[in-house]
Amino acid sequence: WIVGTNRQPPLLHESVDIIICMFGFVSREGFNKILKPGGVIILLDPGDEHLKQLREIIYPVVNKQDTADSKNIEMEGFTLLHSEKLLFNEKLTSNEQVNHLLIMTPHFYRASKEGRDAACQLSELDITVDVNFNVLQKQTS
């Protein structure tokens, strides 16, 4: 597990079999450099409905999510092996759960103080989890 820049990952060239990029920024050049031929990238990106209920509370206007479809998953030098969507609803049943969810998202830092305060006062919240999975394989030549 490494947290670092995707543009210049601190790893040797062609030394990685699998990259999992969760809600991150895709760097074709950086990933291509460190991934072995035939290696795999697993991309997890939020769908349009991901945490929509939370976003409706903390933002005055809810913008459409930047989904995997709009990121042009097809990358030169890679083959798309599989795409799948995970969509389900979950109920947070305590103030602590709502606060933990908010803190673990970038929304905590993007929302206004008023938006954060509104969410932090909730004792429960129905949320939608909407995640797009895409598996790409580096071409061998």
Question: Where are the predicted features?
Answer:
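Conserved SAM/SAH-binding loop
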Residues: 4-8, 24-25
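Conserved Class I S-adenosyl-L-methionine
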Residues: 86-141
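A short glycine-rich, Lys/Arg-flanked "PGG" loop and its adjoining helix->strand segment in the class I
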Residues: 26-42
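Active-site capping/gating segments
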Residues: 62-100
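Short catalytic micro-motifs in class I SAM-dependent methyltransferases
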Residues: 18, 23-26
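A short acidic, Gly/Pro-enriched loop at the edge of an enzyme's catalytic core
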Residues: 7-19
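Conserved class I S-adenosyl-L-methionine
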Residues: 40-73
